Every structure is written in C-alpha cells, then in structure tokens.
C-alpha cells in the first residue's frame, strides 16, 4: 500500500517505491500535504494528531505535492487497483464534499494525461 501524504512527510520516495516494487502496490491512498503547516507542527513538536487537526494533510490539488509523477508511475507499471482520494482535515475548516471533489478532479486529470483509465 502506498499513501502519498504519509510517504511525503516521512521523506519516502513514493514514485521510486511504485517503480521498484509494482507487484507490492495493491492499494493507493492519495492525499496532499501542506508543507508549511507540517513544518510549523515539527517546530513546536506537535503530535501527529495535532498536525492532522492543524491541516497538514489536504485533498489532492490543495497542497504542495505533484501527483503527475505518482500517477505516471502507476500507469507505467500497469496498476489496476483502487486509488482512494483522502481529504483528511477538520471539516470545520474545509468542506469535505468540496475537498473530495477537488481531489477527484485533480486525480482524474492526472489519470487521463497518463492514460491510467479504467
């Protein structure tokens, strides 16, 4: 399983993992990262939960990650499994439906460009 947000914050190259171990990628979670929020949380030694509540994660298209290389790697390795769009943030700060729609729109555009379509 690959989770783009967790991989990015851990300093893991998700694209490299996908390309090196395509048979081990059975499920993909995509979420974006707000690096400034993450950095501020690290500076104050906040907990992971505090970081989530502060908004270090967001839907694809609303943060700092580039999803084109991820989707391209999935297409190149003929990935045919689920891609789950995650919008992990406080619903009081960002409407879940709006953020989910943004994530889906972002991933659909990248998937079409990479010819990763069902």
Feature roles, as predicted:
Residues 2, 7-118:
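Histidine-acidic metal/acid-base catalytic patches
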